[in-house]
Amino acid sequence: NDGVMMQPYLVDQVKNIDGGVIKESEPEEMASPLKKSECDVLKKMLRKVVSSGTGTKAYSSEYTVYGKTGSAEYNDDKDSHAWFIGCAEKDGKKIVVSVLVEDGGSGGSTAAPIADKVFHSFFG
């Protein structure tokens, strides 16, 4: 979204029993903390993580994926939680996913494949 920060909301739509929309949330812009040029650089880096870096297990040739892997050590034995945060897009349809696996080790080997399954399910 070119660096535009959006107002978060929890409910996209409220429908009645017949499936009619009673209320629908509308996206609202909050601020623009990044310039478009800065956002473009970040997107290239996040794309590279998935295409040739630590997040390759979230890569797909069917849609475009961007992401970042990580791990967070939680004790002196250097055991870690695994995480992946990313987004994917295809034909104007977009999804953002955050995966955290407690005691999962590496984000690339544990969390990224879970995100891949979510992306695959979303795009069909």
PLM features: residue spans?
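Extended C-terminal subregions enriched in glycine
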Residues: P33-R47
